[in-house]
């Protein structure tokens, strides 16, 4: 009758709702039992009172067991002569209150219930430290780095993560850290629950598989991936200088119809994922992976289009981007950049890197074709609306000048550059925007 019931870890790892402990008694004692449990703050309001097959009633309680003293109190004082015992509800039914909650509210309720069941006082500090948003990859949830930072969490053990996963309906949890500054864009992600970090994600009909603990995936880039997928690149050869797991390589191959892509990547984990993603999307025969530092790439005079998808800046890749463009016809550079637009802050000219000073001599004259008043044109010469922010246009013009200089030195003759389009991707803060500059680069006709 009075045996304690403890929820097993095996049940938690199945991905089903975590079993809830309940007090079972006869229907005629249900109301008195419930009132007592509510007064003692032991009644679980997130799950329904259930009727058992034998006609008795199960009242869900907080925590993983109910001390014997409470069972004795129920039998002897709350309802003298009553009988009760503990059981487990393997598939507890959420209460109407719980069903009406948002995922964040449900998480708060479930975690607070579990924490208090462990004898730890729930506080405003702990509630403020819960995540408000996350990324879902199938049965894995990726939490942001700014949650679960309070010291109290560290003493609660791994069952905390089982509770979080159950509340949010997943089987695995990971927590994001800062991206590695080593240039490989390796995310500092910690796996909190589960035995591996491999996930699948479908984006615009393209299947990506990758390990979230080793490779990045940005949901915020979907607008740019959709845009490049809509381009007509039939017959074109592309160079993707920062291919990753195939963020842009795959849309260009699968949807834009590129003839061939040279994909550069130096993160070995991303290369494994990229190779796999090319295979599962049926385009492996139209892509060559170049593993290593793209600044040492031996390709030249080959590309109709170059993707420079690295933020906050892809400047280190500009010289090699100029090198791989076709010498006879040129091509288009898609240059990603984070641009600041703080009110009252003057735009500073781009610094010339040490590498460029050593390897690229700057000519006296360059040829550019900057459009006035912030307007841009597409590849058909159609006027587009002005850039939303003047800082974007000023950065684009500065980048255009730098690229024109590099092109003349790399190819030994003047080139003409033209801003085709400035595409906003997303904002990281009120005054930091991720944009993409489409820059057309063409060799000037030889004179006489």
Curated annotation (Swiss-Prot):
Pathway: tRNA modification; wybutosine-tRNA(Phe) biosynthesis. Its EC number is 2.5.1.114. Pfam families: TRM5-TYW2_MTfase, TYW2_N, TYW2_N_2. Coiled coil: none annotated. GO terms for cellular component: cytoplasm. InterPro entries: MeTrfase_TRM5/TYW2, SAM-dependent_MTases_sf, TRM5-TYW2-like_MTfase, TRM5/TYW2-like_N, TYW2_N. S-adenosyl-L-methionine binds at residues 218, 225, 265, 293-294. One of its GO terms (molecular function) is tRNA methyltransferase activity. PROSITE patterns: SAM_MT_TRM5_TYW2. GO terms for biological process: tRNA methylation; wybutosine biosynthetic process. The keyword Transcription regulation does not apply. It catalyses: 4-demethylwyosine(37) in tRNA(Phe) + S-adenosyl-L-methionine = 4-demethyl-7-[(3S)-3-amino-3-carboxypropyl]wyosine(37) in tRNA(Phe) + S-methyl-5'-thioadenosine + H(+). Keywords: S-adenosyl-L-methionine, Transferase, tRNA processing. S-adenosyl-L-methionine-dependent transferase that acts as a component of the wybutosine biosynthesis pathway. Wybutosine is a hyper modified guanosine with a tricyclic base found at the 3'-position adjacent to the anticodon of eukaryotic phenylalanine tRNA. Belongs to the class I-like SAM-binding methyltransferase superfamily. TRM5/TYW2 family. This is tRNA wybutosine-synthesizing protein 2 homolog. It comes from Macaca fascicularis.
